[in-house]
Amino acid sequence: MKITALELFHISIPFAKPYKLSRVYGTRYDAEAVILKVHTDEGIVGLGEADPLNPFSEETPATVMVVTRDHLAPQLIGQNPTRISAIESNLDVMVHGNLLARGAVNMALFDIVGKANNLPAHMLLGGLYQDKVPLLGPIGSGTPEEDAEFIGELIESGYKTVMIKMGALPIRAEIQRMIAAHEKFDGQIKIIVDANQGWTVAETLEFFDGIGSRRPALLEQPIDRHDISGLKRIYQRAPCLLSADEGVASIQEAAALIRAQAVDAFSIKVSKNGGLSKARKIAATADAFGLKILMNSMLEFGITQAASLQLGCVLPNLLNMGHAYMSVLRMSDDITDFDQNISRATVTVPSQAGLGVRLNEEKLKKYTKDYLKIK
């Protein structure tokens, strides 16, 4: 089998409602992605997805398309797509960085190999550890009253974990949000606080002091991704689990955080981490040192969500809480059928070959802003 061509589709789809994040990311009204098709001479087509989010990463939809055209495609066309490790090793030498573009390719290769052997991708990653995973429900920045309304709706829908976005408001306001949510819903739902790099070390410590015993189950990436020493200071004072997200894109960053003993968990995002192969290495390294994994998401569509699920279901070190397999639910539409796997705040691992997701060609055409084919 050989790779014969690549197709790239830059898509944009609005959110169902505006998504308020931290002061770093602002309010988001739509999500963009680059959808990848990798064609083979046997007629098997592998699907991948890159999910750029500025300033989360330096990559944009335009850079993903250019890097794929100019640097990745020349290393892929004519190659045997089943030799995933060899391709990964070659691209590590030939293409530095660009993990989002690399991730789309890696997803597509696993999709091809799974389809060629009539196996779901999780069978290529170690086999099922769990066949169902609970979802977390995300809540954007808002008031305590808005939080209470959204959390109540999530509980009615079966959610047991909520991720509250913070980092946009003054720290005293964020403290009040945490206290209000804990006092109203304690015992009914686990609370994750995600500050998305929106705080300083001092603000984070003030948050800990202010909430007292009304602590979340987990705090994610409160400060700048590069400040490992600051994160360690927070870790030493944290009354809850602490996870890194923006600060753990590569295996080298994961190793640095482990050496520093700065976190309890890593937030895995298959697109951010450069695909299934690299994300699997990060998760395995975390497990070896006793760290847990939160399967999180960028502003993703169904292909990345499907790839993430294929990985998450094989990991023995997932956190005992909800995980971010609800990304397509916050969109006004999706270009796949991934949502059919979701019921009552739980996602069931599909048994179909490859990534286990189907592309809706009409919707792909509808939402495409730019297109590129490389032979």
PLM features per residue range, with description:
Residues 106-140:
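Glycine-rich, aromatic-flanked loop segments that form ligand/cofactor-binding clefts
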Residues 215-218, 226-241, 248-346:
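Shared catalytic-loop signature of beta/alpha-barrel
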Residues 126-238:
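Metal-dependent enolase-superfamily TIM-barrel catalytic cores that perform enediolate-based chemistry
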Residues 3, 36, 43, 72, ...:
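Conserved, mostly hydrophobic/aromatic
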Residues 1-47, 51-56, 328-333:
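Structured beta-strand/loop patches that form or line metal/cofactor-binding pockets in enzymes
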Residues 5, 39-116:
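Metal- or metallocofactor-binding catalytic centers and their adjacent structured scaffolds
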Residues 330-375:
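C-terminal extensions of enzymes
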